[in-house]
């Protein structure tokens, strides 16, 4: 289940890339007085993120159902806490980070999203002592709203900071 249409753009960063960039900033005299963005250069839609998660886990890509955020909230969903659906952040207009300054001044080379996600998933598998998820709420949403899918729209243009 994706809130709204799932076309919201999101831009991630692999934690190892943040650490590497921070070390380069500390070691570079040229970095003094500058701010740098750490991010993957490619923004992804929510649909793409779910697809990449399925690939990283080596499972069949799930069928995605888009349900408007207000209906998820009316049914008892919450953007922060149990029954979390991507949080408020994921409904905002896309804000993407420009990383060319870090690339140019510090030779920043972000890890490919799929590569970083696969490595993160492997680590997750090593430490997954989490309880089995309860999908009762999702099943109820699908029964009530699952067929009401809005027509797909292209994502809004990102705002670069």
Predicted stretch roles:
Residues 1-13, 24-25, 30, 37:
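A conserved pocket-lining segment of Rossmann-fold NAD(P)-dependent short-chain dehydrogenase/reductase
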Residues 2-8, 32-34, 66-70, 94-97, ...:
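Short C-terminal domain-edge/linker segments immediately following a structured domain
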Residues 6, 11-19, 35, 43-47, ...:
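Conserved loop-to-helix N-cap of the C-terminal "lid" that shapes the substrate pocket in Rossmann-like
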Residues 24-87, 119, 128-161:
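Mid/C-terminal beta-alpha module of Rossmann-like enzyme folds, strongest
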Residues 27, 98-99:
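Acidic/polar helix N-cap motif
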Residues 99-133:
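A contiguous, mid-protein "functional segment" used to position or interact
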């Amino acid at each position: 289940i994706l809130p709204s249409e799932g076309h919201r753009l999101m831009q991630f960063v692999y934690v190892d890339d943040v650490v590497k960039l921070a070390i380069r900033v500390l070691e570079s005299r040229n970095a003094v007085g500058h701010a740098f963005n750490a991010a993957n250069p490619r923004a992804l839609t929510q649909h793409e993120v779910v697809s990449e998660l399925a690939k990283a886990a080596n499972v069949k890509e799930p069928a995605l159902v888009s349900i408007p955020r207000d209906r998820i909230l009316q049914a008892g969903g919450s953007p922060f806490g149990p029954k979390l659906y991507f949080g408020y952040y994921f409904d905002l207009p896309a804000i993407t980070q420009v990383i060319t300054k870090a690339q140019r001044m510090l030779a920043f080379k972000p890890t490919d999203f799929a590569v970083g996600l696969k490595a993160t998933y492997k680590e997750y598998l090593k430490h997954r002592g989490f309880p089995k998820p309860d999908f009762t709420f999702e099943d109820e949403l699908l029964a009530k709203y699952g067929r009401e899918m809005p027509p797909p729209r292209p994502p809004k243009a990102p705002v670069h900071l």
